[in-house]
């Protein structure tokens, strides 16, 4: 399955994505905001992701439609949780806003969801702006424990209903 936006194609991962995936996720400025992605990100991790991890429903490689360059990842679960990361080289260009817009359309129209939600970290302002631009509202804050840091932080939750 492929999904399209004005500038992007959301598609399945391929073996050709491996080198770029490793490069994008070995950037500390990207990895520090991802909770489920290991750092450093190795070839072993990329092989597993391409062969198995990305094969679950509704996980997409985010690519630029003009050159097929991998720039990030987006997913939406059958229960409506949405997640996205974009490589630092591609920040501040509106790609995340464009991706989330397409995924909310997919969630409501194709998956027939009545609510889509996302969570981020209080100190990570960019995804909060992306969600707000897409009509999401901050509905609650939950504490979460940061592994390896040894303290609790606030995790804002955002929701959008159909």
Residue ranges and their predicted role:
Residues 1-28, 32, 59-162:
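Acyl-donor (CoA/ACP) binding surface of acyl/acetyltransferases
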Residues 29-50:
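Conserved GNAT-fold acetyl-CoA-binding loop/helix
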Residues 51-56:
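Short loop/turn motifs at secondary-structure junctions and domain boundaries
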């Amino acid at each position: 399955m492929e999904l399209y936006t004005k500038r992007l194609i959301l598609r399945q991962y391929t073996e050709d994505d491996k080198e770029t995936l490793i490069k994008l996720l070995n950037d500390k400025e990207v990895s520090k905001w991802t909770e489920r992605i290991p750092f450093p990100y190795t070839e072993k991790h990329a092989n597993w992701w391409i062969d198995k991890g990305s094969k679950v429903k509704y996980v997409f490689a985010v690519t630029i439609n003009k050159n097929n360059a991998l720039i990030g990842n987006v997913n939406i679960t059958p229960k409506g949780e949405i997640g996205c990361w974009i490589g630092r080289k591609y920040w501040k260009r509106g790609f995340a806003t464009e991706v989330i817009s397409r995924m909310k359309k997919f969630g409501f129209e194709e998956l027939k969801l009545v609510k889509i939600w996302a969570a981020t970290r209080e100190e990570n302002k960019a995804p909060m702006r992306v969600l707000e631009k897409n009509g999401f509202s901050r509905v609650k804050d939950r504490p979460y424990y940061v592994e390896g840091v040894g303290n609790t932080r606030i995790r804002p939750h955002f929701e959008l209903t159909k």
